[in-house]
Swiss-Prot record:
Protein name: Sec-independent protein translocase protein TatC
Keywords: Cell inner membrane, Cell membrane, Membrane, Protein transport, Translocation, Transmembrane, Transmembrane helix, Transport
Record gene name: tatC
PROSITE patterns documented for this protein: TATC
UniProt xrefs under InterPro entries: Sec-indep_translocase_CS, TatC
Compartment(s) of residence: Cell inner membrane
Organism: Helicobacter pylori (strain J99 / ATCC 700824) (Campylobacter pylori J99)
Amino acid sequence: MFEDLKPHLQELRKRLMVSVGTILVAFLGCFHFWKNIFEFVKNSYKGTLIQLSPIEGVMVAVKISFSAAIVISMPIIFWQLWLFIAPGLYKNEKKVILPFVFFGSGMFLMGAAFSYYVVFPFIIEYLATFGSDVFAANISASSYVSFFTRLILGFGVAFELPVLAYFLAKVGLITDASLKAYFKYAIVVIFIVAAIITPPDVVSQIFMALPLVGLYGLSILIAKMVNPAPKDNENDHENDAKEHTKSES
């Protein structure tokens, strides 16, 4: 059994090494310009950030550089992921390689941009001014950067949902009917995921969950275009979902 898995493990190791190497090279480049990146990151907050420990400046530079390196490396990471998956697919299924890499990278960047320009400015302003009549907000640079990177990367990953739906529908694993049948269960999972990948505050979780619900709806439309379910199968999925609900109650 191990001998059968060995080629796959070797291939996985190869793809991971390329991905990690790409991130490392990008990290070294980003670290050289970390101050410029920090100014870009801090642009959404008009207050003053403070340093609480001697090594905090170094930690901030490392966090910012590493997060920027991940964003820059996403096309290579998606390419390596595809090269690992592709050998197990049929020839017609391999035709999704360009959409997978292009839209995967694009949706990640779109999610990060949505977080940076729309979500993060509102959240940081709200949280920083909440209770401002009672106490002054002295936010450390390290906590600010951690909050920022977690939100940005979280939204980047979350926006991959339509890409995943396209890929799974293309290979025939899901249909629009199967996604619609389990919509209410998906809502619960979405809020759980939002609680995991966002900072631990309700505002961030709601701002993450609402776009995810919209992306789930978009995924249904994508699945309908790529792999629509026959009418009979759609009714079967709805009946299965209803029976599952009854059994739980």
